[in-house]
Design a protein with these regions (language model features):
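Beta-propeller domains with acidic blade repeats across secreted/periplasmic ectodomains
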Residues: 22-405
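The canonical Cys-X-X-Cys-His
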Residues: 367, 395, 564-573, 627-631
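Surface beta-strand/loop "capping" patches
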Residues: 401-428, 435
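Acidic, Ser/Thr/Gly/Pro-rich low-complexity segments and short DxT(G/T)-type signature motifs
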Residues: 402-410, 427, 491-546
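Short, surface-exposed alpha-helix to beta-strand junction/turn motifs within ectodomains of secreted
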Residues: 423-464, 490-496, 506-509
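C-terminal capping alpha-helices of c-type cytochrome domains
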Residues: 480, 615-642
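Electrostatic cytochrome c docking/interface patches
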Residues: 538-562, 642
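Axial heme c-ligation environment in periplasmic c-type cytochrome domains
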Residues: 568, 574-586, 600-628
Length: 642
């Protein structure tokens, strides 16, 4: 009897050890990346992609070709060239048996009239003017419920003021609507690089990239008559027939100095971030000019992408995992896909953004659902732009394994905090511990500088938590909620029930445009227990080593690189969005100079990189110095003298 009891206890202890001690699963355990073979000589710099009703996949390339793929989800898709000779296609749609694409200067219908598998009619639906500047990309179309097409136009940049977005021709910096008969309707302006358009439940959304006047990437609800923030397109607000825009460029410049200054020799001076200055935010602009549209969701630059791209809704009814109805957003620079949960509060969209799946071979520009109901085609390119990954272009497919990841399924705003919904039940002990939660809020400057540091940062104390009986929801009381601010919600201490997994992605970024009305929780109905997580010994050792003046190792500096989003754009010895750290080390900057360049980057120092680094004065000086010392330790050692 004693042996049997001992054996049972031993088995139980082993089971608990395995459950509590095993490594938590990661992204690739739930979503697999499949790379189909591509025929030799076929260059897929994917600019547009759409799945046809019969299951074929149409793929448009930036080099002007359109390929039709039979059996695209199979082991050997068959490629057939459908069209060629087009001008940098950056979007593709299907309507009534024809393909519709956005070239640089026109919306084009491609028709295969004789059904031989090749387009024999290239019909111009609508054309718009160009200045021939390289940055005048045109994106779209997305098909509206009435059958018309939405297209968006990039700004150009100045010849001397190469950092400043310009609208040299009408519709640059605009979103516009085109009827099937070719009638154009100006829709909205204030966009800078609107690469991703998405029709969500019949409403138009778009995403933009960090740059001048755009503090960080984000997703905007593109209402008719809205001004999104970049003033270049306002040049045509009163000149375009049918323009719904009321705000003027002069009004913007009277409110925020465009800083078009010159030195004593008459040369234009590039605006740089000014620390400790008085500044306005986009929310301040909205108070003065109500037509200003705030992002429904900010996508923090360097954390949730650097070059936001395709927006696509999950309409698979659960065949792609537990996120039906949510949005997936591609990122060209970081070669990954993010996930977004949207809700409507007091008439405005807002919501939470999460990481989802990284590790694609090149920049994720376009996405399309496969007809198999449970996988997502990923179209990739990085020529001229740079990206993470080992390839310059390609086509891949993201496939759900059928296993449910432990994730925050949704985050909803509450009158006194947030409600977090999970995909699997939480371990209630960890979920009822306030130390499992950490929340801070911040926003961005609205200014003519390229990007913005995070500003007005503040901690938001978690005062209580109420976990639902089924363990699928945790409602948290949060102090210091701020409307229009981004709220970073970190749940590092939470674990799943049973297997005790960590969240695959423990951080959500909720854009709180409106605090909802409603009943608040009472402190008597929530847990207020807080058991702090002890500091790891290794962290103490790292700090001690750094304090002695020794150069930190990569393992010691890696947490700082991750915390400050450095790894989003840089690798140790490989070019990504930015230069490799080994290349920076070859410049032989002093540690102090590197810190200065972190706070105020000089893009002209790296002319071969398309995406300038944003100012990062929020990096603590002691951490910046440690990072600088480590970078300089990578410099090639001089050969010993004979």
């Amino acid at each position: 009897m004693k042996k049997r009891v001992f054996s049972t206890l031993t088995t139980l202890a082993l089971s608990l050890s395995l459950a509590f001690g095993q490594e938590s699963p990661s992204e690739e355990d739930f979503y697999k990346i499949v790379t189909p073979p591509v025929p030799e000589g076929v260059l897929l710099e994917v600019g547009g992609m759409v799945t046809l009703p019969d299951g074929r996949l149409a793929v448009a390339t930036r080099r002007g070709d359109v390929w039709m793929l039979d059996n695209p989800s199979g082991p050997k898709p068959y490629f057939r060239k459908f069209a060629s000779g087009l001008h940098e296609i950056l979007g593709l749609a299907y309507q009534n048996g024809a393909l519709i694409c956005a070239q640089r200067g026109e919306l084009t219908k491609l028709i295969d009239k004789d059904h031989d598998g090749k387009a024999d009619t290239y019909e111009t639906i609508y054309a718009w003017p160009l200045s021939a500047h390289y940055h005048e990309y045109s994106f779209g179309p997305k098909i509206a419920p009435d059958g018309s097409f939405f297209v968006s136009g990039n700004v150009a940049f100045g010849d001397e003021e190469w950092w400043a977005g310009e609208s040299r021709r009408p519709l640059r910096g605009w979103i516009f609507k085109i009827s099937p008969e070719g009638q154009m309707e100006p829709w909205a302006t204030g966009v800078r690089s609107p690469c991703g358009l998405g029709m969500i439940d019949g409403e138009l959304f778009y995403d933009d990239n960090q740059g001048d006047w755009i503090g960080s990437g984000g997703i905007w609800h593109a209402k008719k008559g809205a001004f999104m923030g970049h003033p270049a397109g306002l040049k045509w607000a009163n000149a375009l027939p049918g323009s719904p825009i009321k705000i003027t460029q002069e009004q913007v410049y009277a409110t925020v100095d465009p800083r078009k200054t010159r030195d004593k020799n008459g040369n234009a001076i590039k605006p740089e971030n000014v620390q400790n200055e008085k500044f306005l935010t986009l929310a301040d602009m909205k108070k003065k000019y109500p037509e200003t549209q705030l992002p429904a969701v900010w996508l923090p630059h360097g954390i949730l992408g650097v070059s936001n791209a395709e927006i696509i809704a999950d309409q698979t009814n659960g065949n792609f995992g537990p996120f039906n109805g949510q949005l997936f957003v591609g990122d060209q620079g970081q070669s990954k896909v993010m996930r977004v949960f949207l809700e409507k509060v007091k008439g405005e969209y807002q919501g939470a953004a999460f990481d989802f799946r990284s590790g694609f071979q090149s920049g994720v520009l376009r996405m399309a659902w496969a007809n198999d109901g449970g996988s997502l085609y990923i179209g990739e390119t990085n020529r001229g732009w740079g990206s993470a990954g080992d390839a310059n272009q390609g086509l891949q497919r993201l496939v759900w394994t059928g296993k449910t990841p432990f994730e925050m399924k949704a985050v909803r705003a509450m009158p006194d905090g947030f409600e977090v919904e999970f995909t699997l039940p939480v371990d209630k002990k960890s979920a009822q511990n306030l130390a499992s939660y950490a929340i801070r809020s911040f926003t961005y400057k609205y200014h003519p500088v390229y990007g913005s540091p995070t500003v007005n940062e503040a901690k938001c104390a978690v005062k209580g938590v109420k976990v639902s009986e089924d363990g699928l929801k945790a409602r948290i009381i949060v102090d210091n909620l701020r409307e229009t601010y981004l709220h970073e919600i970190k749940l590092d201490g939470l674990r799943s029930a049973g297997l005790y997994w960590s969240l695959v992605h423990p951080t959500a970024y909720y854009t709180l445009n409106q605090i909802p009305d409603g009943e608040k929780l009472k402190l008597t109905e929530v847990s207020t227990k807080s058991t702090a997580v002890p500091t790891k010994t290794t962290e103490t050792k790292t700090t001690a080593k750094a304090a002695t003046g020794k150069v930190p190792t990569f393992e010691e500096v890696k947490p700082l690189l991750a915390k400050n989003t450095c790894l989003a754009c840089h690798a140790v010895d490989k070019r990504q969005v930015g230069p490799a750290y080994t290349e920076v080390a070859k410049r032989k900057y002093s540690n102090e100079k590197i810190v200065e360049l972190i706070y105020n980057p000089k893009p002209q120092n790296w002319p071969d990189y398309a995406t300038p680094m944003a100012p990062m004065p929020q990096v603590p000086r002691d951490e910046a110095l440690k990072i600088a010392a480590w970078i300089n330790s990578l410099a090639p050692k001089s050969a010993p003298k004979p």
